[in-house]
């Protein structure tokens, strides 16, 4: 019998249980960026913004990197932008979340990697998801979230609309069967 992944730590993925069926966290996959006794924060990987980014927000002379994704990182501070990237030349102000996935960077760094045609993968996340001390543990113990190991393929190369089902399938067992649960159980 395969033992389920149970590491609530930086770099883990939080996969919403099908029981979370409303709101921003419904079928969400969150990359846990920090987890400590003081609380936790992460970025939703599979929710788009639902609107186009205006030129007023993203005003770079030249954007040649086609590996840029705009995501809704979570419901908190939606006007704050966080940068996930795969750049191996890490500026000082970045943090490795899991292998080849980094959080952080300043505006000159973003401009540089956005203007490079062969630039790294970039997820620009607006807002974040946060939990107070002990809150995420309680939600996990209540089976609101499943855990999976994070990796760059999930973060950068998976289609956002397929990510929730993909991670559950990859977990196997009972999780794989949950990946086929329809959004609306009345349609089942």
UniProtKB/Swiss-Prot annotation:
It comes from the Bacteria. GO terms for cellular component: cytosol. It holds the Pfam family DUF179. Belongs to the UPF0301 (AlgH) family. PANTHER family: UNCHARACTERIZED PROTEIN YQGE, UPF0301 PROTEIN YQGE. This is UPF0301 protein CPn_0139/CP_0633/CPj0139/CpB0140. It comes from Chlamydia pneumoniae.
